[in-house]
């Protein structure tokens, strides 16, 4: 399945979650699109589970096949499957760049990673789905530091809270991964148990 490249605000309204991050268009009309968008629809259990899975997929920009792999890995892990799945999604490099405030959206973070602006433990990484580990050190490449995206990130530092499992240090905007996130540190409005139920059928 190809990555979704359509109108993100419309998809946000369809799924009932802001996929952009601070989208004024979504805030004005947080109900489903269409002539009867405001109408209440009694949702089946399956529909609720499917919608929650889609919310997770589109929030993190993950295709179905990859999402299934993440779920299978979460099942094999110790701990609650839903929480393990969210931890896997949060530990993607593109998400870490977004969480650290170096990109306004996850889409932008994915693009910055793909363009080769980052190193992890002094090794260039240009794969957005790369998974960080505890104690990893993520740096912006020196030649990229003074490019517009990172100048803007420095100017807007502090506008969005950085989760406690990450730290951004100094003018070089080095990201330190102190730990992988616990469920309480993940503020995405997802009911992960519904995703577990969807795949358990």
Curated annotation (Swiss-Prot):
The keyword ATP-binding is annotated on this UniProt entry: no
Pfam families: Ribosomal_S4 (PF00163), S4 (PF01479)
Keywords: Ribonucleoprotein, Ribosomal protein, RNA-binding, rRNA-binding
Gene Ontology molecular function: any one: structural constituent of ribosome
Record-annotated membrane-spanning stretches: none
GO biological process terms, semicolon-separated: ribosomal small subunit biogenesis; translation
Superkingdom of origin organism: Bacteria
UniProt domain S4 RNA-binding: residue ranges: 91-157
A Gene Ontology term for the protein's cellular component: small ribosomal subunit
Region named Disordered: 19-41
Role description: One of the primary rRNA binding proteins, it binds directly to 16S rRNA where it nucleates assembly of the body of the 30S subunit. With S5 and S12 plays an important role in translational accuracy.
Subunit record text: Part of the 30S ribosomal subunit. Contacts protein S5. The interaction surface between S4 and S5 is involved in control of translational fidelity.
Family from the record: Belongs to the universal ribosomal protein uS4 family.
PANTHER family linked to this entry: 30S 40S RIBOSOMAL PROTEIN, SMALL RIBOSOMAL SUBUNIT PROTEIN US4M
Protein name: Small ribosomal subunit protein uS4
